[in-house]
Every structure is written in structure tokens, then in C-alpha cells.
């Protein structure tokens, strides 16, 4: 029966590799602490993921849909698609920077209005394992998940929204964490400048710095781009 798993894994990877390649800089990656990694994504290089990791990604998307439904039945007027049935998003810099958001909260029931001074709100949802979830619930998004923090700040900037309700599902206990995050114009500008810097470097055939020149650095060893990063080992 192990052969079934092997066939399944191979087909999942094959399907992933057959999908249309991204030809823009995704906002979800701009906050990463390795500029070289972000640049490789922008340049269309493909990260290497195991079938198990790809399944985990898919499970996360399904769980986010479930969280959205829980929120709707609890009094949130949450929209995850626009009037054309497409995911909310934006495109800027002549299509070189794009973002797609989980949703917008346009209103809430009366018992929830005390928590939200204005609408609409950006809604962004993540699924986290227990330890990561606990850390975020204790210290907040900005300190524990800088990539996600950059993501929501840029979303708010480009969609002209003043607040984001960040929601995290604990995949081990089903607990939910909510954090109301205000728009920070300085942070958004800083991340936007970083995106422009990466695009310009690629246009000039310049390499952005890697987080480490040592391929044995723990983040490099876990990176899906470890086999295509030209800086490592130089």
C-alpha cells in the first residue's frame, strides 16, 4: 500500500509544477527577511516543496474557508469574493506587484459593533500549529510574524483600508485568535520601498543579498530555493 502514497505524492508534485508560474512580486512574500529569496520568487524561480508540504498548503486553504463560515454565522458580514466572484486583490507597478486578500468585513451584528469603530475592515486569516499560535496570541502579529505583518500593511495601503482583523486558527486545538491591526503608513511605505528595490535589482541583473552566505544556516537549509540561490557558497 505504500506504493499508493508514492504515486499520490508524485502526482501532487506533478500537478503543482504544471500550474501557471507567477510573473509578479507577491505581497505575501515581501516581508521575508531574505531579500534574495523574495527576488527569486519575483524572477519566477520555483521553490521545491514536498508533496506533504503541498498538502499542508491545501489543508490550510480549506481551514481558512471554514473559519470564514464560522465568522459569518457568528455575525460577521464577511465578503471573500468581489461582485465578479473573484478574490479581492490589487495590481500596481504595471502589474509587477500584486496581492490577493482573504476578505473584507463590511459590517457586523450589533453585539460585535463595540469592537469595530469603522468599516470596511481587511480580513486576513492564517492557520498555525500550537506553539506558533500561542506565541502570536501572547506577543502579537508584528513581533512574531513579520511576514504576515508586512502583508496586511501593504494590503491596507493599496486597498485604502484603515484596519485589519487578523485571525489565526490553532490547527491543534481549533482555538481562534483575533487581533485588530491599525494601518501603519510608515511600515507600509518601508515595505513598498523594499518591493521597488527588489524589482529594480532584477531589472539591472543585480542580486539581492541572501540572509546568509553559509548554506548550512538553518533558514537556508529549510528554504525551498536552496538549490537555485546563486549567492550561497560564494
Located regions from the model:
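Residues immediately flanking
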Residues: 125-127, 225
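Metal-dependent nuclease catalytic regions and adjoining charged, substrate-binding loops involved
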Residues: 135-149, 154-234
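A structural signal for short, well-ordered beta-strand segments and their strand-loop junctions
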Residues: 79-80, 122-124, 163-168
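Metal-dependent nuclease catalytic cores that hydrolyze phosphodiester bonds in DNA/RNA
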Residues: 1-122, 129-131, 142
